[in-house]
Amino acid sequence: MSRIADTFAELQSKGRKALIPYVTAGFPFVDITPALMHGMVEAGADVIELGVPFSDPMADGPVIQKAGEKALALGVGLAQVLEMVRRFRLRNSTTPVVLMGYANPVERYEQRHGKGAFARDAGEAGVDGVLIVDYPPEECEQFAADLRGHGIDLIFLLAPTSTPERMQQVARVASGYVYYVSLKGVTGSGALDTAAVEAMLPRIREHVKVPVGVGFGIRDAATAQAIGRVADAVVIGSRIIQLIEDQPHEKVVGITVDFLRGVRKALDA
């Protein structure tokens, strides 16, 4: 079993839900990411999603787009993100780390370092899962096999518009968990309709046997608690970025820890 599967199995045995915070690697300061990841774990995070900065992030709203632009301006690319994971792993060998991003940085990395280099280097760095927003499941079987060979799960997005056929395609290649995008649109947009999420999850589970995490639109502990009643995991990204984007270096980790502790407490209530 993968580190992600182990984590979900342990949580399930205790009747708990996974808290999955997201942050853009290298934001808001290029050197802060490993410390921020450790703070997230201290606050109760079960899995960490680390965004790989990209210049054209079509699924991201303005908050995460701006974070990615800042990280890119600071020189953060895929190689630097892998180094951040390596540094995190010096002190933490148990918390799963998922890279979330787009195909272009992965393809450029492989052009530079050779075919299969991304899966190899990500595995060596200590990455547990990869979510590539613009890789369709029907074209991912070889990529999924490459990742599996290095102990890495391939995670996919599902949306309110996903058909049963798309869910079946995802189910064939997905492992770890799937990420249900609870709103139409981009990250950080709109108000979350928890009843609509609750209605959709049984349809997803007819086809998908891995845990289902829900994200997009979760901004506070109360919403996280409501989603946690029906989903296996709660993913929070844009709200964290907003909380830390204008903060001085010395306050970033503490603000994140305080926010996530409140969410963790609500999830466990």
Swiss-Prot record:
Pathway: Amino-acid biosynthesis; L-tryptophan biosynthesis; L-tryptophan from chorismate: step 5/5. The keyword Thylakoid does not apply. Pfam families: Trp_syntA. Gene3D superfamilies: Aldolase class I. The active site is at residues 49, 60. SUPFAM superfamilies: Ribulose-phoshate binding barrel. Tetramer of two alpha and two beta chains. This is Tryptophan synthase alpha chain. The lineage of its organism: Bacteria, Pseudomonadati, Pseudomonadota, Betaproteobacteria, Burkholderiales. The gene is trpA.
